[in-house]
Swiss-Prot record:
Name of the molecule in the record: Threonine--tRNA ligase
Chain positions covered by the region annotation Catalytic: 253-555
InterPro entries cross-referenced by the UniProt entry: aa-tRNA-synt_IIb, aa-tRNA-synth_II, aa-tRNA-synth_II/BPL/LPL, Anticodon-bd, Anticodon-bd_dom_sf, Beta-grasp_dom_sf, TGS, TGS-like
Domain TGS as annotated: residue spans: 7-70
Length: 666
């Protein structure tokens, strides 16, 4: 045996299951994957070494823990899609020489790249770029990381790549960085921190969706660019499944169903981002509000109402102005009889109004907690390109509550708010819920109010409550509000998409700004702590998500029309009216269809209208004082007396259960 081999250093690699693998120093993540199995090596996207994601080609230098990252994980998808954006840029550079590249990140579903090019991209170009991406993938080009001094990288991108955008990033964003990383992919090179795929060969299927206008660094005063969106997968099967899910999502689009089911309308004459509830949609909203109001009453909340506008000084005091000035409507200026000017804002938040309600009288420690609740409408000047039906609007109603409590009550009150939010989601059929503890970014203190000590205590309280409620949570650094940390609830709908809905927030800042107090057992004034809480988040957004989650097949208690009576022939119209009236008196939302149409057509149209129950009556039912009951999407449920049928529906309404579990079928 040679002297070199005798002296070769062996490293110990510990896998997630606790087993260890001895490997020579300099082995790579791909070597580890191959040691475990060739199939895993084929599926590997990157590897975590001591908890940090790195390239599969990175050499090992010490004993470590290792975990292979595959496409199945969120982190794996992000790495795969980020690499796909590089492959797309590579393809564009080959097809359209002279193109320059801005930002090209992975996003929640795929990736995009901003391109500066004299060529105006078309749909036909997208198909050509897809083909070239697959051709590049077929070349099995290694994706190689190179670390380089920043000064040298500036010269490289200035003279070799001739890319002014990367030069700007290197001289501006990364000016404090000594060493940067580049990724080479054959003749294409990009500036990136990585990690990336081992080779282009991992990409097996790609779809580019659309082209939109963008600006360099999102600044409208800078260069105009073209943004191309796409998604890629390691198998053709996964792409087909994704495209199928997109088609299903189109069928479930709340804007489409909202029109078809006559739930709400959007009118340019009223204004962009200002949805109007039609009678059927208003019923859904009223039912949800009544449900939460009753649950809040049971849990000790007190209802309040506040105006739609407020003096601008109120929002300056709270800090909402200027923190949210970019997303607020311009102030309204009012001059009184003496010419004195006062400025008002369309209410961007309910919080300041509630704080003044709390401070309108002296509070004792025995009075706390005080739980104020309101369905309060607020207004945000969202950019027109960000508006999306109900889920992103300029005027929306929050199920807002503010809880004022003593320090010894805080964790209990946070837990109660978490419990209420969970109850709401479970009742509405959202069974997959992720929880994010949104913390402040200590490197960006100017973004937040309050002191470092206050933030440390608030975040400690949030963690304690989450742990007590046995929540599986993840940390979101920089996701906190300016006044405190949050517990954000992210639901997964029937198509697997994620939506952030409810929130619970702890606030030590506003009590100081509004000089809130209570008299303690020692006779001295003390500061309460505020909890901001909204299980729905906003009524508009929640209902928009609920429409898509259920595909408009609402549970019986929420359905705008809970049943329709369908007479088979004209000679039983009178009996149909009798059945309808009995159901109406019982409190069931019911309609009567007396059109001169065949019963089969009436049933089909009731199914299309997604009415939960069809009550069919013919001569036999009239003579027997009965009805034939049919359930939407399921079919015949049998014969019942009018009273039995009414009781059956009322029991199901009272139970507030989903009539059927949400499915992927509309």
């Amino acid at each position: 045996m040679s002297q070199n081999l005798d002296q070769q250093v062996t490293l110990t690699v510990t896998l997630p299951d606790g087993t260890t693998k001895p490997l020579p120093a300099g082995s790579t993540g791909m070597d580890i994957a191959l040691e475990i199995g060739r199939r895993l090596a084929r599926e590997a996207v990157a590897i975590k070494i001591d908890g940090k994601a790195v390239d599969l080609s990175a050499p090992l230098t010490a004993d470590c823990t290792a975990e292979i990252i595959t496409f199945d994980s969120p982190e794996g998808k992000e790495i795969f899609w980020h690499s796909a954006s590089h492959i797309m840029a590579h393809a564009i550079e080959e097809l359209f020489p002279g193109s320059k590249f801005g930002a090209g990140p992975a996003i929640e579903q795929g990736f995009y790249y901003d391109i500066a090019s004299e060529h105006r991209f078309t749909e036909e170009d997208l198909r050509a770029i897809e083909e070239r991406m697959l051709l590049i993938a077929g070349r099995d080009i290694p994706i190689v990381r190179e670390e380089m001094p920043r000064i040298q990288a500036i010269e490289y991108f200035r003279t070799v790549r001739e890319d002014p955008y990367k030069v700007e990033i290197l001289t501006d964003t990364l000016k404090e960085t000594e060493t940067v990383s580049l990724y080479h992919e054959g003749g294409f090179t990009d500036l990136c921190s990585g990690p990336h795929l081992f080779s282009t060969a991992a990409l097996k299927a790609v779809k580019l969706f659309n082209i939109s206008a963008s600006y360099w660094r999102g600044d409208q005063s800078r260069e105009s660019m073209q943004r191309i969106y796409g998604i890629a997968f390691p198998t053709e099967k996964l792409l087909k499944a994704h495209l199928s899910a997109l088609e299903e999502a189109k069928k479930r689009d709340h804007r489409k169903l909202g029109t078809e089911l006559e739930l709400f309308m959007l009118s340019p004459e009223i204004g962009s981002g200002l949805p109007v509830w039609l009678p059927k949609g208003a019923i859904i909203r009223q039912e949800l509000e009544s449900f939460l109001k009753e649950e809040q009453r049971r849990r000790g909340y007190l209802p309040v109402y506040t105006p739609h506008i407020g003096n601008i000084d109120l929002y300056k005091r709270s800090g909402h102005y200027p923190y949210y000035s970019d997303s607020q409507f311009p102030p309204l200026t009012y001059h009184d009889e003496e010419g004195k000017a006062e400025q008002y804002l369309l209410k961007p938040m309910n919080c300041p109004h509630h704080h003044l309600i709390y401070s309108s009288k002296m509070r004792s420690y025995r009075d706390l907690p005080v739980r104020l609740a309101e369905f309060g409408t607020v207004y945000r000047h969202e950019q027109s390109g960000e508006l999306n039906g109900l889920v992103r609007a300029r005027g929306f109603t929050q199920d807002d509550s503010h809880i004022y409590c003593r320090p010894d009550q805080l964790v209990d009150e946070i837990c109660n708010a978490i419990d209420l939010t969970r109850y709401v989601f479970a009742t509405l059929g959202f069974t997959e819920v992720e929880t994010r503890l949104s913390m402040h970014d200590p490197l960006n203190p100017s973004k937040y109010g309050g002191t470092a000590d206050v933030w440390e205590q608030a975040e400690k309280d949030v963690r304690e409550a989450a742990d007590r409620m046995k929540i599986n949570y993840f940390i979101g650094v920089g996701e906190a509000s300016f006044y405190g940390p949050k517990i954000d609830f992210i639901v997964r709908d029937a198509l697997g998409r994620k939506w952030q809905l409810g929130t619970v927030q702890v606030d030590y800042v506003m009590p100081e700004r509004f000089d809130l107090s209570y008299v303690g057992s020692d006779g001295q004034k003390h500061r309460p702590i505020v909890i901001h809480r909204a299980p729905f988040g906003s009524m508009e957004r929640f209902i928009g998500v609920l429409i898509e989650h259920t595909a408009g097949n609402f549970p019986l208690w929420l359905a705008p029309v809970q049943a329709v009576v369908l007479p088979i022939a004209e000679d039983v119209h009178d009996y149909g009216s009798e059945v309808r009236d009995a159901m109406h008196r019982a409190g069931i939302r019911v309609e009567l269809d007396v059109r001169n149409e065949k019963i089969g057509r009436k049933i089909r149209e009731a199914e299309l209208a997604k009415i939960p129950f069809m009550v069919i009556v013919g001569q036999k039912e009239k003579e027997g004082g009965s009805v034939s009951l049919r359930r939407h999407r399921i079919g015949d449920e049998g014969a019942f007396s009018i009273q039995e049928m009414t009781e059956k529906l009322l029991n199901e309404i009272a139970a507030k259960g989903l009539t059927t579990k949400p499915t992927t079928n509309a």
